[in-house]
């Protein structure tokens, strides 16, 4: 897991930074697969900070493929940050039923692991 506090980056309107005085941020992760020098991870944010997953991965030396803000501007692998919400659990606002919404991995991300 990654337990690093996050705060706004004073030099940017968009970026966040790891800062000991920032808001607590905790991310659990599990490596699911490796291929072509890339890894498929399950990331589970335990807090909900802006850019938390992107910043936490970059801060441990593993930025997301295609992440121009916290990684590299190289868009040859994928033209966007390789981040996808596969499964979301939420409570229905009327019935209170717990819903699990699943979205398969998009084609551009599947190609990265072929």
Regions found by a protein language model. Give the residues of each.
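RNA pseudouridine synthases
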Residues: 1-114
């Amino acid at each position: 897991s990654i337990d690093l506090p996050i705060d706004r980056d004073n030099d940017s309107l968009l970026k966040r930074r790891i800062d000991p005085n920032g808001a607590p941020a905790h991310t659990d992760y599990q490596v699911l697969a490796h291929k072509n020098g890339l890894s498929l991870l399950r990331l589970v944010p335990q807090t909900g900070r802006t850019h938390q997953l992107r910043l936490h991965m970059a801060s441990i030396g593993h930025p997301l493929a295609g992440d121009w803000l916290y990684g590299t501007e190289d868009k040859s692998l994928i033209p966007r940050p390789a981040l996808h919400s596969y499964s979301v659990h939420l409570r229905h606002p009327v019935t209170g039923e717990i819903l699990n919404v699943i979205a398969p991995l998009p084609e551009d991300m599947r190609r990265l692991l072929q």
